[in-house]
Design a protein with these regions (language model features):
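Positively charged n-region of N-terminal signal peptides that target proteins for export
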Residues: 1-4
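Bacterial N-terminal signal peptides
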Residues: 6-15
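Short, structured motif recognition centered on aromatic/hydrophobic residues
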Residues: 69-77, 86, 106-107, 196-204, ...
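Alpha-helix capping and inter-helical loop/turn segments
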Residues: 81, 207-211
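Preference for long, well-ordered alpha-helical segments
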Residues: 118-119, 209, 229-248
Length: 262
């Protein structure tokens, strides 16, 4: 059933054979919708690759759980503002075990790493998915939270490096990076540090921002992401953000893997 849901998610198809067909129909009426026949009329090979390779193979690969594949895919879609597939991927993520409060935090996190407008575009889609599935305020994160523990030594080292490199020229950015990102956003408890890192790494690769990949991939692995999971996340992203972005990421990731203790 989850594979079939994924098929629909990938193409935003109307013929989703699940109990939620009627629930999702209303929210997609105003959005562009494709059927398998639509795709075959334009690109029959694409339809075959979608069913046989992407959904029949990539989404079934071991090494990265379906929940994590949904997190990676959502992060890529939001980072690139690709709204046509968001309704079904939000639904698929929920089916795969991503909680509404986690989706909320993913969108909030990506406002900082992919831009406010992209996050707001995701909100516009997610609100209808949440409404169709009766997701209420009790299932969402509160604004004021008890933050996760801060790695004081690691944060002091990061802050000192950034201050030394950029503090004199970009005081505002340096201040917000410390006060808002690493002493606030990253400590919100409704998205685990590992998952928050996975979202960040996925968004960086999705937008070809490799300069920040080394520290964030290291942070992800410090937070519990394994090398196998990181490799599979990059494999997943090849199909959603394109081979060139992934081939730009692989040398960076390979270097991170090689330099970490074994």
């Amino acid at each position: 059933m989850k594979l079939q849901a994924a098929v629909v998610a990938l193409l935003a198809l109307t013929a989703m054979p699940s109990a939620r067909t009627e629930e999702t129909a209303a929210m997609t009426r105003s959005s562009p919708v494709l059927t398998y026949e639509d795709v075959r009329k334009v690109a029959p090979a694409l339809e075959a690759y979608t069913q046989n390779r992407l959904l029949g193979d990539v989404w079934k690969r071991p090494g990265l759980a379906p929940r994590d594949r949904s997190i990676v895919t959502l992060a890529a879609l939001i980072a690139r503002n690709q709204t046509i597939e968001m309704p079904y991927h939000f639904n698929l993520a929920l089916d795969n075990g991503v909680k509404p409060r986690e989706i909320s935090e993913i969108i909030t996190h990506l406002a900082f790493y992919a831009g406010w407008a992209n996050a707001m575009s995701a909100v516009a889609v997610a609100k209808d998915v949440f409404a169709a599935r009766d997701v209420g305020a009790a299932q969402l994160p509160v604004v004021s939270v008890t933050p996760l523990p801060l790695d004081e030594a690691g944060e002091a080292q990061r802050a000192a490096f950034v201050q030394d490199q950029f503090g004199a020229s970009f005081r505002g950015v340096v201040q917000y990076t410390t006060d808002v990102l690493f002493r606030d956003l990253w400590l919100r408890p409704d998205l685990a540090p590992r998952d928050r890192s996975l979202v960040t790494v996925s968004a960086l690769i999705a937008n070809g921002q490799m300069a920040q990949l080394t520290p964030h991939l290291n942070r992800a692995m410090d937070n519990g992401l394994t090398q196998t999971e990181a490799s599979e996340a990059i494999t997943q992203l090849a199909f959603y953000v394109g081979w060139p972005n992934v081939f730009s990421a692989m040398p960076v990731a390979k270097d991170v893997f090689a330099k970490r203790p074994h």
